[in-house]
Amino acid sequence: MTDLTRLSAAALADLLAAGEISSVEATRAHLGRIEAVDADVHAFLHVAGEKALRTAAEIDGRRASGEKLGPFAGVPVAIKDVLATNDMPSTSGSKILEGWLPPYDATVVRKLREADLVPLGKTNMDEFAMGSSTEHSAYGPTRNPWDLERIPGGSGGGSAAAVSAFEAPLALGSDTGGSIRQPAAVTGSVGVKPTYGGVSRYGAIALASSLDQVGPVSRTVLDAGLLHDVIAGHDALDSTSLTDVWPSMADAARAGAREGALRRVRVGVVRELNGEGFQAGVKQRFEESLGLLEGAGAEIVEVSAPSFEYAVAAYYLILPAEASSNLARFDSVRFGLQVDPAEGPVTVERVMAATRDAGFGPEVKRRIILGTYALSAGYYDAYYGSAQKVRTLIQRDFSAAFERVDVLVSPSAPTTAFRFGEKLHDPMAMYLNDITTIPANLAGVPGMGLPIGLAPEDGLPVGLQLMAPAHADARLYTIGAALERLLEEKWGGPLLAQAPDLSATEMLASEEGAV
């Protein structure tokens, strides 16, 4: 008996296409897994349930009638709650949007539906994607499937946890400064931030519009490539959308899984992203991965990107400045929460103030205040203007590095998953958790995080980040898949096969969810 929740999305797609399983069976298996473990993990804010089963049954009916369907038809998928869905609440992890049902789908959600994937539900996240631990969700934290007392990363901890807990084979996330790649690192999953503009942002509730990017979360590099192919492409509804014709990321991943894929590839190790403050086990697994790459024919080159030293400081001026503008739309007048003032006249201004005070959490308020200050008269040039100059220097550092190497690598995060509360009241410690991922967002280049082992001191996942030049996303998939193959040969299988069993009472196979 095969547990369908343990299969990759590619394997599920093959079984569905061959008629060996139905989409209803695959969907029911994952809904069963959610029911069994999500009370502990809390990856989901909303589960589609019967709607997902109806969608799956409709796809099965069309397949049975002989209709030609896409390669991913019938495969379940989870969706980060930052993305608008016209049939499920879209809260962005905030009380101010509790219960809000958008009148439209985000473009990436529409593309999922057009490709006949089956949405399982919406995943938890830090409020308005502001955080690195999912502790800032208004609906409670998500827990790391490797250790339920530790964080799953953020802001997209729900999507990463859903995938690594085998509640979904695939998920969509968003990445503003590492919100896909950092959760992937600490949960043992794969996450990709595409080139800025490569995937539509229309319908993604904006945090920082010049930094946000939607991307795939999965358990394998190939699965990420397959989902990337579904969501990529130009969208006239997004003014920042690129008109590029993108190659198949899945084909790039398949090419990387072949022998010789790493021969003569130049891999740059960024000196500034592998220094003090990095956990010993993270550095050890990173160095071991470099050894595997070199042993397979890659050339390892140390490169310097001096401006990366200022990336965190610049990011935490640019992001709050843009967020303070984007979040001004939550005014209680047109949609979302509305709170009347406790006393005094009920005016639009006072209702807005009362609503924002009740509806926004402390981290969101902190960043709105910081961003408003950075944009204020007399401080704009000193803070926001200077941060944008640093951003330009970082882009130049990337350009110079990519003249010497094909990809850049670093640890995806400086540490493994930390315990709940450990950094919650120390904003700087929390912000520094994104030190390796932020530069790619500031420059708009693509980045991939993939698991490279468990840290010896705590037995928790460690991730490696790959970065490529803008528009060269396919390069990440080729090199990422090649490294994944080398690592799994060394481990004797996927890293997530070593993850703890979350539910002793869960039936691993049932009449509805096994073949």
From Swiss-Prot:
Keywords: ATP-binding, Ligase, Nucleotide-binding, Protein biosynthesis. GO terms for cellular component: glutamyl-tRNA(Gln) amidotransferase complex. It catalyses: L-glutamyl-tRNA(Gln) + L-glutamine + ATP + H2O = L-glutaminyl-tRNA(Gln) + L-glutamate + ADP + phosphate + H(+). The active site is at K80 (charge relay system), S155 (charge relay system), S179 (acyl-ester intermediate). GO terms for biological process: translation. SUPFAM superfamilies: Amidase signature (AS) enzymes (SSF75304). The keyword Zinc does not apply. One of its GO terms (molecular function) is ATP binding. It is an enzyme of class 6 (ligase). Its EC number is 6.3.5.7. Allows the formation of correctly charged Gln-tRNA(Gln) through the transamidation of misacylated Glu-tRNA(Gln) in organisms which lack glutaminyl-tRNA synthetase. The reaction takes place in the presence of glutamine and ATP through an activated gamma-phospho-Glu-tRNA(Gln). Heterotrimer of A, B and C subunits. Belongs to the amidase family. GatA subfamily. This is Glutamyl-tRNA(Gln) amidotransferase subunit A. The gene is gatA.
